A protein has these predicted regions:
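Core catalytic lobe of class I
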Residues: 1-303, 314-317
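Flexible, disordered linker segments and immediate boundary regions flanking tandem C2H2 zinc-finger modules
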Residues: 304-309
Length: 318
C-alpha cells in the first residue's frame, strides 16, 4: 500500500489503511476560506467553527489509529476572521482557469453565529489544538511559520497577518523525534583558547569571554521557522512549501518509513517524502489531482540536493 493515494472522503478512506505510518504531516482545508468543490463531503464549509473542529477531531482520531505507537502528527493550520456576509459569497478554487476564484453563493456562510462578533478572530488553530488534546493527543509544541512574503491585506485597523501555526502532537508520551536531523548552525559559537584560559569568537564580532565549558557549531532548531511561500503553477489553490515540511519529515521519521497525509492536495507531502527516501500514503477528495501529484513527484528537486556530477581533482589535471 506504500506510495498510494486513496481518492475519496478521508473519513472513509483512512479506514482502508493496512499499514502503520511513522508520522503524519498535513495542512487541512482552513475554515470558511475557500470552496474546493466536493459539495457536502468537503471539510471547511461547515456552518460553525465548532462543527469544523468536530469534523477535524474525527479525522485525526482515524489518523491516530494509522500511526505507529511512537508516531507524531505535524499539523499546519491557519486562522479565520468572522465576517457576516449577507450574500454568502466565498472564492471558488479549482483546476479550471475559467472557474478559478469565481465567487459562488453559499447560504452556509451567511448565517449569523452566536458568540462571534463581526471582525472577530475566531482562533481556529488553538480551538483545534485543545480539542485534539482533549481527544487524547499529546500537545507537544506550537511552531510559528513566519512568512517573509505574506499575502497583502487592505486592512487599516490591524497588522497584516504573516504567520501560521504548525502543531506537533504525539500519539503517546514517548515518541520518535530525531533532534540531530534538524539542528541549525550556531552563529556565535566559540573555541577554547588554552593560552589564556578564555574562549575566543573569531569572525563573530564578540569579545573573548570565560566561563564556558563547551561550545558547539550547531544548536537545537528554534520554534519560529521563516519559510517563503512559493506558488505552484500547476495548481490554482494554496500549497504549503516543501521547505516547510522537510524538517517535520526529517525529525519525525527515518528512511524507509511511511509518511501519511489525509489531505494530500497538490502532493507536497508525497514529493518531500520521496526526496528524503521515505514512502507516502495519502488521501485526496478530488481524483483529478492524481496526475498533478505524480508530476510534482517526478519534477521535484530539493533545494539542498547536492549535484551528482563527478568531482575533479586538480592534481589529476596537472
Amino acid at each position: 500500500m506504500r506510495d498510494t493515494i486513496l481518492f475519496g472522503d478521508c473519513r472513509e478512506t483512512l479506514k482502508e489503511f493496512d499499514e502503520k505510518a511513522r508520522m503524519c504531516v498535513t495542512s487541512p482545508p482552513y475554515y470558511g476560506l475557500r470552496d474546493y468543490g466536493g459539495e457536502d463531503s468537503q471539510i471547511g464549509m461547515e456552518q460553525t467553527p465548532e462543527e469544523y473542529i468536530d469534523e477535524m477531531v474525527k479525522v485525526f482520531r482515524l489518523v491516530r489509529d494509522c500511526l505507529t505507537d511512537d508516531g507524531t502528527l505535524w499539523l499546519n493550520i491557519g486562522d479565520s476572521y468572522y465576517n457576516y456576509r449577507k450574500d454568502g459569497c466565498i472564492p471558488k478554487q479549482t483546476f479550471s482557469n475559467s472557474r478559478q476564484d469565481l465567487p459562488i453563493t453559499t447560504p452556509r456562510r451567511s448565517n449569523k453565529l452566536q458568540g462571534y462578533k463581526d471582525k472577530d478572530l475566531i482562533g481556529i488553530p488553538w480551538m483545534l489544538a485543545f480539542a485534539l488534546r482533549s481527544d487524547g493527543w499529546y500537545l507537544r509544541q506550537d511552531i510559528i511559520w513566519h512568512k517573509p512574503n505574506p499575502m497583502p491585506e487592505s486592512v487599516r485597523d490591524r497588522c497584516t497577518k504573516s504567520h501560521e501555526y504548525i502543531f506537533l502532537l504525539s500519539k503517546n508520551k514517548n515518541y520518535y523525534y530525531d533532534n540531530e536531523a534538524i539542528k541549525e548552525p550556531a552563529k556565535d559559537w566559540g573555541t577554547r583558547d588554552r593560552t589564556n584560559g578564555k574562549y575566543h569568537n573569531e569572525g563573530t564580532g564578540l569579545q573573548p569571554h570565560s566561563g564556558l565549558t563547551k561550545s558547539y557549531p550547531t544548536k537545537n532548531k528554534r520554534s519560529v521557522w521563516s519559510v517563503t511561500k512559493k506558488p505552484y503553477k500547476g495548481a490554482h489553490f494554496a500549497t504549503f512549501p516543501p521547505e516547510l515540511i522537510e524538517p517535520c519529515v526529517k525529525a519525525g521519521s527515518q528512511e524507509g518509513d511511511i509518511i501519511l497525509d489525509p489531505f494530500m492536495g497538490s502532493g507536497t507531502t508525497a514529493t518531500v517524502a520521496k526526496s528524503l527516501n521515505r514512502d507516502y500514503i495519502g488521501c485526496e477528495l478530488h481524483e483529478e489531482y492524481g496526475t498533478l501529484i505524480q508530476k510534482r513527484i517526478r519534477d521535484y528537486v530539493p533545494l539542498n540536493k547536492v549535484s551528482q556530477e563527478p568531482s575533479i581533482n586538480i592534481l589529476d589535471i596537472i
